[in-house]
Curated annotation (Swiss-Prot):
Residues found modified as Methionine sulfoxide: M109
Sequence repeat positions: 67-88, 89-110, 111-121, 122-142, 144-165, 166-187, 188-210, 211-231, 232-242, 243-266
BP GO terms, sorted: adrenal gland development; amyloid-beta formation; blood vessel endothelial cell migration; cellular response to lipoprotein particle stimulus; cholesterol biosynthetic process; cholesterol efflux; cholesterol homeostasis; cholesterol import
Purpose of the protein: Participates in the reverse transport of cholesterol from tissues to the liver for excretion by promoting cholesterol efflux from tissues and by acting as a cofactor for the lecithin cholesterol acyltransferase (LCAT). As part of the SPAP complex, activates spermatozoa motility.
InterPro entries: ApoA_E, Apolipoprotein_A1/A4/E
Name assigned to this protein: Apolipoprotein A-I
Underlying gene: APOA1
Protein family per UniProt: Belongs to the apolipoprotein A1/A4/E family.
Post-translational modification summary for this protein: Glycosylated. Palmitoylated.
Compartments where found: Secreted
Length: 266
């Protein structure tokens, strides 16, 4: 029951900071969230890929070709890890600059969101109370049927299901009524929040477009700086890949040549 109210509160009020609001944790920056997800994904791909390479090399065909893919894979992952370490501070700087430039707008929107959240909290509390009462009423109606089933024989199962069906439909219909009522109560505040956001953006536009143009110019500037600072790391990645690719090509050509010799000798 609490999960329903929690979900609604998260949906209407907390947005991307829901974890911080409910758990009182320090909110992660956008870069921290992206970095964590990317790290988990890359590590999973890396470990999974290495397992496949190891399985192939252990196979009869892998042993016959002797491509040394596992050594090349380890070299590749080491190079990618080095690239990630080099680019990490650069991308962190980009996110820090972007957050700094939009701090005022984010503070204003957070203030609006907090105000709306306080106004709709009574409606959420009322919904929680009504939902609890409906569930308790349903439990009271179902309890005698459960006792009847325990006391009766198996053939009464169908009869019990027939009795439970209308009760379940009644609970669903009454829940829909409460949800619709809650939606109607929250609608004005949702519209109000949208209007405030539109007003904030309109104010930026009416400022001669200077503020929006400034945001765009600064974002472009930060992206250009990120691109320039990442070039050396990307070049290091390319240079690191060349020996790996060359080793793979030599091993593959040697394996093909060996196979051709065996065919000609037959």
């Amino acid at each position: 029951m609490k999960a329903v109210v929690l979900t609604l509160a998260v949906l209407f009020l907390t947005g991307s900071q829901a974890r911080h609001f409910w758990q009182q944790d320090e909110p992660q920056s956008p870069w921290d969230r992206v970095k964590d997800l990317a790290t988990v994904y890359v590590d999973a791909v890396k470990e999974g890929g290495r397992d496949y390479v190891a399985q192939f090399e252990a196979s009869a065909l892998g042993k016959q070709l002797n491509l040394k893919l596992l050594d090349n894979w380890d070299s590749l992952t080491s190079t990618v890890t080095k690239l990630r370490e080099q680019i990490g501070p650069v991308t962190q700087e980009f996110w820090d600059n972007l957050e700094k430039e939009t701090e005022v707008l984010r503070q204003e929107m957070s203030k609006d969101l907090e105000e709306v959240k306080q106004k709709v909290q009574p409606y959420l509390d009322e919904f929680q109370k009504n939902w609890h009462e409906e569930v308790e009423l349903y439990r009271q109606k179902v309890a005698p049927l459960g006792a009847e089933l325990r006391e009766g024989a198996r053939q009464k199962l169908q009869e019990l299901q027939e009795k439970l069906s209308p009760l379940g439909e009644e609970l669903r219909d009454r829940a829909r009524i409460h949800v619709d009522a809650l939606r109607a109560q929250l609608a004005p505040y949702s519209d109000q929040l949208r209007e405030r956001l539109a007003a904030r953006l309109q104010a930026l536009k009416e400022d001669g477009g200077a503020s929006l143009a400034e945001y765009h110019a600064k974002a472009s500037e930060h992206l250009s700086a990120l691109s320039e600072k990442a070039k050396p790391a990307l070049e290091d990645l390319r240079q690191g890949l060349l020996p790996v690719l060359e080793s793979f090509k030599v091993s593959l050509l040697a394996a093909v040549d060996e196979a051709a010799k065996k065919l000609n000798a037959q």
